[in-house]
Amino acid sequence: MAYSYSEKKRIRKSFGKRPQVLNVPYLLTIQLDSYEKFIHRDLDGQQGLEAAFRSVFPIVSNNGSTELQYVSYELGEPVFDVRECQIRGTTYAAPLRVKLRLVAFDREAAAGTVKDIKEQNVYMGEIPLMTDNGTFVINGTERVIVSQLHRSPGVFFDSDKGKTHSSGKVLYNARIIPYRGSWLDFEFDPKDNLYARIDRRRKLPATIILRALGYTTEEILTMFFEKVLFEIQDNKLLMILVPERLRGETAAFDIEANGKIYVERGRRITARHIRTLEKDGITQIEVPVEYIVGKVAAKDYVDLSTGELVCPANTEISMDMLAKLSQAGYKELEVLFTNDLDHGPYISETLRVDSTYDRLSALVEIYRMMRPGEPPTKEAAEALFDNMFFSADRYDLSAVGRMKFNRSLNIPEGVGTGILTNDDITGVMKKLIEIRNGRGEVDDIDHLGNRRIRSVGEMAENQFRIGLVRVERAVRERLSLGDLDGITPQDLINAKPISAAVKEFFGSSQLSQFMDQNNPLSEVTHKRRISALGPGGLTRERAGFEVRDVHPTHYGRLCPIETPEGPNIGLINSLSVYARTNNYGFLETPFHKVVNGQVTEEIEYLSAIEEGNYVVAQANSNLDEHFRFTDTYVTCRGEHGESGLYKPEDIHYMDISTQQVVSVAAALIPFLEHDDANRALMGANMQRQAVPTLRADKPLVGTGMEKPIALDSGVAIVAKRGGIIQRVDASRIVVKVNEDETIPGEAGIDIYNLIKYTRSNQNTCINQIPCVNLGEPVARGEILADGPSTDLGELALGQNIRVAFMPWNGYNFEDSMLVSERVVQEDRFTTIHIQELSCVARDTKLGAEEITADIPNVGESALSKLDESGIVYVGAEVKGGDILVGKVTPKGETQLTPEEKLLRAIFGEKASDVKDSSLRVPNGTSGTVIDVQVFTRDSVEKDKRALEIEEMQLREAKKDLTEELEILEAGLFTRVRNLLIESGVSEVNLNNVAREKWLEQTLDDEAKQNQLEQLAEQHEELCKEFERKLEIKRNKIIQGDDLAPGVLKVVKVYLAVRRQIQPGDKMAGRHGNKGVISKINPVEDMPYDENGEPVEIVLNPLGVPSRMNIGQILETHLGLAARGIGDQINAMIKQQQEVTKLREYIQKAYDLGHGSQVVDLSTFTDEEVMRLAQNLRKGLPLATPVFDGAHEAEIKGLLELGGLPTSGQITLFDGRTGEKFERPVTVGYMYMLKLNHLVDDKMHARSTGSYSLVTQQPLGGKAQFGGQRFGEMEVWALEAYGAAYTLQEMLTVKSDDVNGRTKMYKNIVDGTHQMEPGMPESFNVLLKEIRALGIDMELDED
């Protein structure tokens, strides 16, 4: 494999046996593609804004004289860029302008004659734009819209599994779910009558729906039943025989024909009997007259002579009726064919329950059910029913719904529209009856073929459409008022409802979430999250086990591991690594096609529906060098997701990769295959909580997924085009682009500005550090600068720590850990947290609040860190209680005492009519001020500090743009110089002339002269562009800020807090092995090995066996080997051994094992080998892919190569006594994470605080400044000890005895240490509650 310059800096050795055929796809595709489809104009009108506009427009007035037509739309440019929106607290959005046409028709002339046309661009609010990383900036905060997994539109057949009725009878139902519109349900009741419900309302007999569709009783019976024909001949009754129908029946009479008895009375009719009847060609048999009694007539029988209805359809035939029919001259009778086995009389029975008799009565019944209390009219009833299922405005199955509907009912694809037809409804009822009759199966609603993904674009389109529909009503009313002279489309349209709908969705929808920005992995995972909750989805309380469970169709689509613990388990999932959505919104996953046992290179994506029809082999099946299966039988997933053994020639597809099952976070866990699933779940979830450390450290033992995640997360800077690094400093990287990648006529310079010390949503620090040097070549897509938690373009969430598994004086009891002081000294787990504190000056009733350094009753020392405007200076180190922004608020006039009047007279007015409301540092926080922002309302004069900040921003902007111009000019003038030298101008002359003069030269060669003129034009354009950009920047900086009503000024202060690791902080590995630090131990007391190397963390070995996460042990062994090889390389470098030996040793390490990766160091120059060796000194980075990882022999081989014992265990010595521990200990390197559960954020101390209003007990929690709850178990403990007085004060004066605690405070102040406990307030509450029940309780006083 050929490596690029920057890839050669550090190569991760992979143990993967399977070659990676398909690169990991771009991880944010699901977000970006979906929103792209929403915003970009789709000329077919199938999706996005275009579809929304076309579904609502044209809007026609009620009298048809005018209509408002939609022509096209365009999105403008956003006013501020993403960064500016975050600073200013505004939404990153673009204005939407729609071209509308108002057409007025001439009512006197022929229909369709146009009288007047007005066309105009109408502003329709702002549409939030997605940033490059798949997020939205709403009101200054980054948010993510999580995709939703909802029930696909279509028809579903289900059963209650016998839970509804006490008899345990299984009741079947069918539900037609449209994308938009009313639901239609059909269900059986315990008596086997078929009922219908509309929108889950009161149930009606299903035949009412059929009558409302215009069917008569006779037509209904013909549609749902087969007929049996009886003939009356010479007072005999003959039945036309269809032998197959008799199967399973018990003969009620001797079945005989031509004198031969085929079945005796009372015998069951078997398949043998039927075959005999068919062989003998028996087509009719004589039946006793009683046999027809009780059968149901299939149609109306009328006495033609009198016109009397002798036997209505769906009536049981009696002897009297039979006589009448015979008299009326009927020779043939049609009855319904039913039996108990597989032709139930359900519709016939339902018709008897149905009280309606024709279409109108059915429509009236439906109207009464839908609109109770309203008097029905014929027109209203018809309009209601038609609008419900047959109007494209009110009902839409959508393309997905129609596809699912047709598949379910075996209708050819492409037939039908978004609305229902009579055949659709009858088809559903027929299939439901078939299922009840025992033919056909119910659907599995948890199958991923029945659940689809609804992503950002689709949800935004639905919200936008809701807004448009609201506008439509208003426009139609306005058009119908007449008098449209001089009215333009802009006058008709009010954009507020549209903006409101969009704003509500992005701002407060359940699926619009505050982005989890702890680290790059948490960002990526949040964007790939799939939630079953949210509008139109499930609710936590109603979701049962089945929905939450892992389903066979999740394979390769949704991760079976990564889901939250707690009430949301199984409802929130994560997309698997290779999964994507298809056009219908169903999840697909890639497979290799297999032909005759030969795995081909062809890759196909299959959805869950398609995969069910094939046999799929696993990715780790054994193949020979020609990619043929070597085993006689291969373990595969067969039809319906069941696993079994299959022959190679029966296999259709093979998995693409071993990590295709799991999500991005689970794919980061090395040796996942050796961890228990519950612990793997915790490991995947805890990686998302890791805080970026001060210096990122790549994992020694990884899985190879670290690079794609870091690249796709967007936290690092990636080269857009290849080139050479021309300039690099802490805040900017400049790349001179390769000639073959430049566009003709451009300067060929790419400038990347780095993000420095910015606050994330979780208050962690976002900072980018260049990882390239001057003059280095870079290729397109390579990393230029590392972001938080990335190291040379690889995800680095924690630190490689030397761990030992052994008990140590009880300090690692119950998952706690003992940490060496060295870890603290080296700042291994030091993190920077940035807090934003804001101070708002408002206009109050008593006057405006003022930000000032002149604060009453505050000493000089407290003001020492403020400037003259009353705002803290940047760089100040502050601690809890310090003033950051001085602010005074006017207070109301009060009556003054004579003393106060005197003081006022002496010290002047100011002192008393304002109170101090300054912004102070919260208690328990200390840090450094790293930035201050001042926002001022337009009408308010800017203070000195605001002007200083403005000037500084202007200077910065000008400096940035000037530098940019200089770089671009330098590139341009280099090309001019080369051109002039080629044309014969001497270098000496050029050096003596100012660069601008070069462009005025005239050349003999016409082509070169043209080139020179082009370059001169470009130079002019560059200067103009510079001026334009500067002007825009200047205007943005100078203009006033758009603040909330009543707000005059906002000051934001950013504090950087440096947090070292300390006891009480939570740490974890990647295998769900979490714990809390119990003690920071001096280095000299830590156990050490025979080389004097102390361990850094001591873990409890008892945390492993019961938890079954053995992956951590294997990781420790492999980590030790990786570090051992690093140490060997380090020793060789220190001994200054020659490069060939170094090359040989490193090559040996890369060649070890049976991995498919090939690293050929012979293609590297000596310099490149040395650079690689320098980067490997701290250990050889290894990749052990999920389910395809390192084997025991490979781990032992590496340990041997590193000169370490192959057992992975080392003799340790006690640091305090120097004695040897009695047995060898497992020591190695484990990747440890510091989680965002820091003791500093959790611990607080309550002094005088707030009390609950009713119970008068202290509140709980840090946010409420609450106390510790003394719960019932604690009370039992004190009771058990007999500590009566302690218990008494706990339950009274220290809690809710109001008078007692007041007296006690007074006593302490007076110095008398006594207490008088009284009645706790909670007892009074109990008394009141008992009285509320009407029971009077009185307390006797002794």
Curated annotation (Swiss-Prot):
Q: Which GO terms describe its biological process?
A: DNA-templated transcription
Chain segments annotated as coiled-coil in the UniProt record: none
Quote the InterPro entries the UniProt record gives: DNA-dir_RNA_pol_bsu_ext_1_sf, DNA-dir_RNA_pol_bsu_external_1, DNA-dir_RNA_pol_su2, DNA-dir_RNAP_su2_dom, DNA-dir_RNAP_su2_hyb_sf, RNA_pol_bsu_bac, RNA_pol_bsu_CS, RNA_pol_bsu_protrusion
The record, for PROSITE patterns, names: RNA_POL_BETA
Q: SUPFAM superfamilies per the record?
A: beta and beta-prime subunits of DNA dependent RNA-polymerase (SSF64484)
One of the entry's Gene Ontology molecular-function terms is: ribonucleoside binding
GO cellular component terms given for this protein: DNA-directed RNA polymerase complex
Q: Which domain of life is it from?
A: Bacteria
Give EC number(s), comma-separated: 2.7.7.6
Q: What does this protein do?
A: DNA-dependent RNA polymerase catalyzes the transcription of DNA into RNA using the four ribonucleoside triphosphates as substrates.
The protein's matches in NCBIfam families, at most eight in alphabetical order, are given as: PRK00405.1 (NF001616), rpoB (TIGR02013)
Name of the featured protein = DNA-directed RNA polymerase subunit beta
